[in-house]
Amino acid sequence: MEVREWLKLHRKSKKPLLNLSQAAPMSPPPSNLLKYLSEQYLLTENHLYGDVLGDIPLREEIVNLWNEEYSSSICINNVAITSGCNQAFCAAISTIASAGDSILVPVPWYFNHEMWLAIQGINIIPIPCDINMLPDIETAKKLIDKKTKAIVMVTPNNPTGVEYPSKLVKNISNLARDKNLKLIIDETYKNFGNKQSNILYEGKW
């Protein structure tokens, strides 16, 4: 919010301003979406508890979408709806790690990931990156020990925006498989970049 106020004071700058602040929405939702939501708000059934894992029609649609996009063969039992990727990360971490365990995360990382791991008492082990902001796979191998439970990737990366090459994603996937680690991939921004030809699209994940 403070950055936005600062921008208002410099609207007439002679040079273009590059806004590299938090990717928070600054425009209102489309009017047709607001109209639809207001109509749904008046329906009694929308104020009752639903399926814990999410509405079945929505999960079925996601199954169809992912099976087509990723050449996979998942079913509705493999899909759970969460309140955004933050909750999905929290749920995933809670099922695979406990206080005192470790999770490998490339730097720089998404700040909410660090906060949740800290709250849970889980150690975050930084994987250093090269000059192109890509994680060093050889260093990652040396960081794994008996307390390591998973490797986390965000691609395109938040906050750098770097898309991890398919070869790198595959190498990290193989490392996780070889070391019997879970692999958590956050693709929040995947539709903002190029379609990546990586393991996710090979039907092997």
Where are these regions (language model features)?
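N-terminal small-domain helix-loop-helix segment of the aminotransferase-like
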Residues: 1-84, 91
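Residue-level signal for alpha-helix termini/capping positions
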Residues: 11-12, 42, 97, 144-145, ...
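Glycine/Thr-rich phosphate-binding loops of Rossmann-like dinucleotide-binding domains
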Residues: 28, 89, 113-114, 160-161
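Short acidic capping loops at alpha-helix termini that bridge into adjacent secondary structure
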Residues: 73-79, 100-102, 147
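Active-site pre-lysine segment of PLP-dependent enzymes
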Residues: 118, 125, 134-150, 159-205
